[in-house]
Structures are given as structure tokens and as C-alpha cells.
Design a protein with these regions (language model features):
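The feature captures the beta-strand-to-loop junction immediately N-terminal to the Walker
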Residues: 40-41
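ABC ATPase NBD Q-loop/coupling interface
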Residues: 68-90, 246
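ABC ATPase nucleotide-binding domain helical subdomain, centered on the C-loop/LSGGQ "ABC signature"
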Residues: 126, 130-145, 152-153, 256-260
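A short, proline-enriched helix->beta-strand linker immediately N-terminal to the Walker B motif
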Residues: 174-178
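P-loop NTP-binding/switch modules centered on Walker-like glycine-rich loops
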Residues: 181-185, 189-271
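Charged, flexible cofactor/metal-binding loops and thiol motifs
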Residues: 242-312
Length: 312
């Protein structure tokens, strides 16, 4: 199968007080047409920076330090485009849509939500104002905003957090992108609203053929919605597997530690969760071997320096 998106060895750095912080250090992954994948990891693992890097949205003091990004087996490396050039703007929103982490602050408070969606449609699809307005209302209906016609003229602060996130999804899908990146898209919402939005995104993906990358720290979300999972830790991919295989037979000690540390409904009463001792390494001084090595309790720990990233 031809890959829809292929990311090769992407690196992102931040320079602070003379130190180079390698936030993302050689991450590679791929996405197939119509597929939903998950990228999971704890806070600070580099998930969001990876996604921002492939769209060249990293601003100073950060920079994309290397790597390649290809769409549909194309010959052009997206990272070779000028960050603010026309080609990169066509990719952002037009080919790859992104739902950002903060629905409360990602919408412009002085413009109506309808206008913000309409503007995206006019820019990427080339529709006139009236056609773009009709398309924007259609998108609001698609994400189940009640009375979409009148709420086209509402401002962000007139909606609840869950409704704002629906609007963010509508905006990300408005230009009919082939790929949707959902970066912690439901983190600040209650579990019922989370489930509703994730099921809605899954349904929309099936209807439109859109591929989705779910970026989250919540293993339960990717267990239910993703077909494949990439596990990130300290700027690296530690493990990649099909969802069922990863939960049944995790290979890397870090993945095994994560699964031992989360509660499950099927757990017997009184089961004690096992935390992972220690802290992630300083990304400004990360070792050249497996970054989980100092915290690893695996019997294969002595091989970790040789066998990174799979030392389990």
C-alpha cells in the first residue's frame, strides 16, 4: 500500500541559555490512506513538537534541525519548502488539518466562528464568499452544532468548551484535508464529551476517507480508536505495533511499564499499580543510548545500550 504520509528521522531543537535541547531526536513514522494511528507518550515526550515540526510551525528559539516529510510518495520534502511560502501554506489546512490542544484559546475572540471557518474555505478551496458561507454552515452541522445557521454569527466565548472543540474540528476539516492531526484534542473535556467527539471524528473519517493521527497521553483513547500505535519517550519512538499486539505483547520495557501503571476495569480488586521510578533524562544532555536505560528494570537492561530502541 502506498503511504499517505511518511516522516523520516525528523529532529527539532530549542536553544535556551546557550544549551541545545533536542526535543525530538530522529522520529520516523508513516500513515496509510484512511487509517487512524495513535502517537502516545507522557508530557514532554515530544509528541506535539513532532507534529508542529512536520508542518513547520516551530517558532524561535526552536527550529526543525533535520528530517524529511513526504506526502503521497511525492518527491518533494515538505521541510524543504520555505516555512511561510505558498507551498507550505497549501499543505497546512489544505492537505493536513490540525486540531490544537487548547480549544479555549485557539479561536479568535473578536471574529465570529463562522467567519473563521469561511476564511479557511475561501483560502484553500477558492470558493466565493457565499459558497464558502454555505460550506461553513454545512461543516457546523457535520460536527453537530445545533442551529448552525444562526450560530455561524456567534463568537467563541458564547460556546462551551465541548462546542468550541467541535468548531475546531469543523475548521480543521473545512478545507477537506487528507490528514487530520488531533493533538490532545479532548484533554480538557469531560469523559462523556471526549467519547462523543472521538466517535464523531471516527465517523467523519469513515465518510470522507480522511486519515487521522491521534496525539495523546491517554492509552485508553488509542486502544479504542487507533489501528496502530507509536509510543514516544524523551524525543524518540520507543515502540511501534498494531494496537492489539501492543496491548497484548508490549516489547519495550517502557511500554510494559506504562501498561502496568494504568488502571483497568478488568483488574482484580486490590491490585496495586506499579509506577515507573525516576524521571526522563534532560533533553539537553540525553545519552546516546536508550533514554529509558536509567529507569529500566528489565532483565535485558544490560543490552539497552546496544539494542536501542528495542531492548526488551
Amino acid at each position: 500500500m502506498d503511504k499517505l504520509l511518511e516522516v523520516r528521522n525528523i529532529k527539532a531543537q530549542f536553544v535556551t541559555d546557550g544549551n541545545v535541547v533536542n526535543a525530538v531526536d530522529g522520529v520516523s513514522f508513516y500513515l496509510n490512506p484512511g487509517e487512524i494511528i495513535g502517537v502516545v507518550g507522557e508530557s514532554g515526550s515530544g509528541k506535539s513538537v513532532t507534529m508542529m515540526s512536520l508542518l513547520q510551525l516551530i517558532s524561535s528559539p526552536g527550529r526543525v534541525a533535520g528530517g524529511e516529510v513526504y506526502l503521497e510518495n511525492g518527491k518533494d520534502n515538505l521541510l524543504s519548502y520555505p516555512p511561510n511560502g505558498e507551498k507550505m501554506r497549501e499543505v497546512r489546512g489544505g492537505k493536513i488539518g490540525m486540531i490544537f490542544q487548547e480549544p479555549m484559546t485557539s479561536l479568535n475572540p473578536v471574529l465570529t466562528v463562522g467567519y473563521q471557518i469561511q476564511e479557511t474555505i475561501m483560502l484553500h478551496l477558492g470558493l466565493d464568499k457565499e459558497a464558502a458561507r454555505a460550506k461553513a454552515v454545512e461543516m457546523l452541522k457535520l460536527v453537530n452544532i445545533p442551529d448552525a445557521e444562526s450560530r455561524f454569527g456567534y463568537y467563541a466565548q458564547q460556546f462551551s468548551g465541548g462546542m468550541r472543540q467541535r468548531i475546531m474540528i469543523a475548521m480543521a476539516l473545512a478545507a477537506e484535508p487528507e490528514i487530520l492531526i488531533a493533538d490532545e484534542a479532548t484533554t480538557a473535556l469531560d469523559v462523556t464529551t471526549q467519547a462523543q467527539l472521538l466517535e464523531m471524528m471516527q465517523d467523519i473519517a469513515k465518510k470522507t476517507g480522511t486519515s487521522i493521527i491521534i496525539v495523546t497521553h491517554n492509552l485508553g483513547i488509542v486502544a479504542q480508536y487507533a489501528e496502530r500505535i507509536y509510543v514516544m519517550y524523551s524525543g524518540h519512538i520507543m515502540e511501534h505495533a498494531g494496537t492489539k499486539a501492543l496491548f497484548r505483547r508490549p516489547e519495550h520495557p517502557y511500554t510494559r511499564g506504562l501498561l502496568k501503571a494504568i488502571p483497568r476495569l478488568s483488574d482484580p480488586k486490590g491490585k496495586v499499580l506499579v509506577p515507573i521510578d525516576g524521571l526522563p533524562p534532560n533533553p539537553a544532555n540525553r545519552p546516546p543510548y536508550c533514554p529509558f536505560y536509567p529507569r529500566c528494570e528489565s532483565s535485558e537492561r544490560t543490552d539497552a545500550k546496544r539494542a536501542f530502541p528495542r531492548c526488551g
